[in-house]
Amino acid sequence: MTKQEQKFRERRVADRRSSSHKAIKELVQTRTEMLASYGKLASHQPFAQDGEVGVLLQKFCEALIDYTASAHFQLYRFIELEKERRGSVRQAAEQNYGKIVMTTKSILDFNDRYEDESALEEPDRLKTDLSGLGEIIARRIELEDKLIKELTASR
């Protein structure tokens, strides 16, 4: 391999790494916003049918969907499109992607149930559902962090 070819190859690798780091940064940002929104909503227990809880719930649902979409489109799609060539990253993605998809279904179900403020008519159910969702989000974050660890590891 000539020096010019080597430099070109190194530049392509650097570009791919830059793309993956950007995707990670965006994922972590949307995750942080979602977790902050979750905390604000959860701190308003016991839940009551008032405007404040409804607004917090809607903001949380929006942040939750933004986070879920960011994870899919920024991180997993990056790997799916085979822009990532490291075997350890691809292996981590294969081991965890199916589990992450299952959490996505639960997230979407929660959003569908609570996108309408009439769901506040059952505050005890919201408390239970929010607690269960918190566990699902924690599991999802663990799985994503495994992927992030591989993406940020040096060769």
Predicted regions and their residues:
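Surface-exposed peri-terminal alpha-helical interaction modules
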Residues: 1-155
